[in-house]
Amino acid sequence: MIVPDTEGLLIYSYGLMYGSYCMACQMLIPHFQCIPGIFPNFRISTELIKTMTDKLEQPNNNVPQQPWGPFPPAFGGRPSGEQTDGNPGEFDNDAAHQQTAPFMTHFFPRIGLQFPDFTEYQRFNGFQRNAFFPNPFGSQFTGQAFAQSFPLHNSMTTMDGFNLTHAPHPFSTNTNSTKPKDIENTVQSTIKHSSENIQDKPPVLSVEYPVKYDSELKFDANVDFTAVPKQESSDDSTLKNLKKSDQQLQQPQQFTFPPPLLAEKSFEQPRMREDVLPFHPQFYPAPLDMGTNFKQEMRTPPIDGHIDYRKFDASGKRMEFQPPGALHDCQVCLSTHANGLHFGARTCAACAAFFRRTISDDKRYVCKRNQRCNNASRDGTGYRKICRSCRMKRCLEIGMLPENVQHKRNRRDSGSPPRKTPFDTFFNGFYPSFQPSGSAAQPITVSSSESPRHTTN
């Protein structure tokens, strides 16, 4: 039984339950007869039903509340014309000034500010998207009172302006104009030119470096960089450095010889190398009368400051084998990196295996060029340019010892049975008067066709 109310509300019949509440009397338990209640109670129950119904119908009727569906769109800026042009330093949210970022709408739908699109400079300027780099002194100096321009440091695009005075470089890179008078005139004119424009230049730390030309830097590496003292002017220090560099150019270059005693390792006893030519400059004030190659080597010192003595033999003549590296390449083939000491010399694994096979197999080689093979490296096809006879000769010349090679008959994995000591002479070293018990005892003999434990009576 449904009775319409005067106010448009519905009053249900007695006993009808909506959830756990009765529509008529708001009882919490099921019942067959309701107790008539007050009319405002029916109004309360009707309002509760309407509220519950609105919550259930909200996802289907959400046009006035959420026009975007389940997720709000990204902030695209206010429509043009809604806001006036304000201070450019403030956040600009005009739709016409926004930069598009379509991937941010998909991954971050509920975030208004799209973080990866901002640079660090824009973050410190109120997240302004169209922010350009302003005056380095900031926007607080852009008024009418600050119309003049402030002098800045010169741009350090090259190393010429680094930590030096703001003037043209006083030294010319041309090696022909190295006369002291020309350099002094250049320095004086440069100092005069720089003193005229010193008022509009900021103060910087003045550090002078001794200038070395290409011909001087090649052999002189012991000159330290010196800073100009405070009580000394920069022009005086520049002239002193020029005179010092000119004196160093006139002095002959001196280099020291390495000691003839060399050690392969730190824990190895030093020994006299056969391929090192001993030289003592205190006993020979004049150059030795040796080959022209050795004199030419002494006359032109190398860049690294030492002479490779391995290029010369005991007579001072240049050797045919010239290793490119002193201790890193194989001393036999000269083209492979040495991986250690093999039989007393620093060689590669291939040359060590060749030497071991030749000695253990007792091989003999003959050179077809009458021992004139002088290149142990490989050619373009991979074959060696030296024969096996000259290669073996080279192994012996550099100091590989044949007695260090283990022969096949002494190897553990060889096929021949080991040599055994007879039983009656086994204890002779400990007991000289030892005799086996029994006069009929015979010594044990071992043959290759019989078992080692077989005894003959």
From Swiss-Prot:
Induction: Down-regulated by the cyanotoxin microcystin-LR. Disruption phenotype: Worms are defective in chemotaxis to the volatile odorants diacetyl and pyrazine and weakly defective in chemotaxis to 2,4,5-trimethylthiazole, but respond normally to the odorants benzaldehyde, butanone, and isoamyl alcohol. One of its GO terms (molecular function) is nuclear receptor activity. One of its GO terms (biological process) is positive chemotaxis. Changing A350V: In OY43; loss of autoregulation, loss of chemotaxis to diacetyl and pyrazine. It is found in: Nucleus; Cytoplasm, Perinuclear region. It holds the Pfam family zf-C4. InterPro entries: HNF4-like_DBD, NR5-like, Znf_hrmn_rcpt, Znf_NHR/GATA. GO terms for cellular component: nucleus; perinuclear region of cytoplasm. SUPFAM superfamilies: Glucocorticoid receptor-like (DNA-binding domain). PROSITE patterns: NUCLEAR_REC_DBD_1, NUCLEAR_REC_DBD_2. Residues 57-95, 230-252, 435-457 are annotated as: Disordered. The keyword Repressor applies. Changing A349E: Loss of autoregulation, loss of chemotaxis to diacetyl and pyrazine. It comes from the Eukaryota. Keywords: Chemotaxis, Cytoplasm, DNA-binding, Metal-binding, Nucleus, Olfaction, Receptor, Repressor, Sensory transduction, Transcription, Transcription regulation, Zinc, Zinc-finger. A zinc finger (NR C4-type) spans 330-351, 367-395. Residues 327-407 bind DNA. Expressed predominantly in the AWA neurons. Gene3D superfamilies: Erythroid Transcription Factor GATA-1, subunit A. Required for the function of one pair of chemosensory neurons called AWA neurons that are involved in chemotaxis to volatile odorants. Acts in a pathway that specifies olfactory neuronal fate. Regulates the transcription of olfactory signaling molecules such as odr-10 that specify AWA neuron identity and function. Represses the expression in AWA neurons of factors such as str-2 which specify AWC neuron identity. Heterodimer with a partner that confers DNA binding capacity or a nuclear hormone receptor whose DNA binding it inhibits. Belongs to the nuclear hormone receptor family. NR0 subfamily. This is Nuclear hormone receptor family member odr-7.
